[in-house]
Amino acid sequence: MTTFLFLRHAHSQANSGGILAGQLEGIGLSKDGYAQVEKLSSAFKDLRIDRIISSPMQRCLETVGSLAKSKKKRVSIDKRLIEMNYGSWSGEKLSKLSRMKDWKVIQSKPSTFRFPKGESFKELEARIETLLKQLSRKYPKETILLITHGDIVKIAASLTVGSGLDNFQKFAVDPCSLTTISWSAKSRTLISFNQKIVSVKGEKRKTRRSGNTLGGSKDVA
């Protein structure tokens, strides 16, 4: 049985701006995000971690840097943990995207959708499932910290409970939250979901009118 600790990156500049960042380069953490990172080492103090694997995106690497040092672990990069390729939607305001005709399809039938010049949800699900299967076979007794993005965590939770791709948008994942799952060849278990492990004094969230999710949580873009 392999235990996966999914840590969504801390609050980012894109979160602050209500932007769908996707795989755009040069997007780091916000002021709130750096404040969250300062508390991560303490939050993980008593948690066993055998290895750390991260998305290659800047906001993920900034999230895990000091935590990895405190655990004296090297951070490996796996491109399968990268955020979804939202294609031509990348860099756009979520307030604008939520008014587009395709938004309803993304929320209710994501299995049928591919982003223009980007990735399909089926492809995203396939790369995450392949990664988790490979890691659980290779490291059957380890606890692995994965630093990644909102939609990846949501897909992993959906795969674990067997809710199906068309229901994964019902999950919501906050920045710097922890989701814990275990996988083996015979079973999959969701141990905890969207656990708030750090808080920032005075932290404020931007609420989207749609109440739907893309890229993470309902109330943080």
Regions found by a protein language model. Give the residues of each.
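Acidic, low-complexity terminal tails and accessory targeting/binding regions
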Residues: 2, 84-95, 137, 142, ...
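Short, hydrophobic/glycine-enriched beta-strand segments
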Residues: 3-9, 147
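Active-site-proximal alpha-helix that buttresses catalytic centers in soluble enzyme cores
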Residues: 11-73, 77
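Phosphate-handling substructures
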Residues: 14, 69-129, 182, 189-192, ...
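Active-site signature of alpha/beta-hydrolase-fold catalytic machinery across serine-
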Residues: 66, 155-159
